[in-house]
Amino acid sequence: MRIVVALGGNALLKRGERMTIEAQRTNVRIAAVALADLARDHQIIIAHGNGPQVGLLALQSASYAPELPTPLDVLGAETEGMIGYLIEQELMNAMPPGTRIATLLSRVEVDVNDPAFTSPTKPIGPVYTAEEAKIVRAEHLWSMVSESTGGLRRVVPSPAPLAILGLDAIRLLVDAQITVICAGGGGIPVVRGETGKMEGVEAVIDKDRTSALLAQMLAADALLMLTDVAGVFRDFGTPDQALIAHITPPELDQMVFEAGSMGPKIAAACAFVRAGGALAGIGRLSDARAIFEGRAGTRVLADAKNKQHKKQAKTMSKPTSMSIGVAVTD
C-alpha cells in the first residue's frame, strides 16, 4: 500500500533533550528502524516536522547582532536539508542494499491573506522557563504560549497549505518506486506576489496539514502521523483519560483539541479521510506498523470503511502496489 508518513519534530528530538546533531542522529536512527519495517511491505513517502530545529536556528540568527535575522522561509529550507539528510542516511543504512531514496526541498503555496498571519499558533524552538521566556520576549518581541507539559515556547504564523509546488517531480519519483522524503517542516512557505511571482514569507506551515494534502495528491491509501504520544485521548490530562482506538471525522468534530499540538493532527486526519483516504493514524513512532494494522494508536476512518480496512490491514503480510506516506510531528 502507499502510505504517507509524517514524523513529528518531537519524535526526532525528545522533549527536554539538548538540540545537538548527535541527539537528533540517534533519534533518527531509531525512527529509521520503524520506517524500514513498514517499508518492507509498503511504499512509504516521508514528511517530517521541524519545530524544535527551526526555532533554534531562528534564535541563533537573532543572536547575531551585526546582521538582520534570517527569515523563517529560508530557515525552513535549511531544516529540510538538515533533517532530510539525517533521515535519508539512516534509512538507507536500515534498508536492504539497492534501496533508492531521494530528499527534495518542497515549496508550499499559502494565502498571503490567511488569518493565521495575525494569530500565531505554531510552537517552535526550545521550551523556556517563565523567567527565560520573559527575557526572550522582551529582547525579540516574540509571541509565546504555554506548553501543556510545562514551560513556554515561541509561536509563529501557520497558514494553511494551498498547493505543493513541484508535486509532479515528487510523483515522478514515487511512481519510479523511489522512497521520497519531502514537505519537511510543512514545506517552505511562499505566496504569490502582485506580479504573480512567488515570494517567501515568514511562517512555518503545519507539517500534518501539508502531509494530508500530499497524501491526497498522491492518492495514498493511508496517512500516519507519528509523534511521542500514544494517540488521541478522551478527557486528556484527567484521571479518566482513555485512548481512542478508532473514531470517525464527525465524532472528532464534537471534540476540542489544542490549536498548536493535537488540533492540526485531528484536522489533517479528518481532511484526508473525508477526501477518500482509507485510514489516518496517530500515535507513537515506535508503533508505526501496529497503528497501521490496528493494534495501537488512534485510527480515523470513515464509517463504511472501518471493518473493511481493519480486515485488510491484519491480513496484509507481503508487499503490494500501494504506497504509504509518513508524517513526523513537531
At which residue positions do the language-model features occur?
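C-terminal catalytic "cap/lid" subdomain
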Residues: 1-330
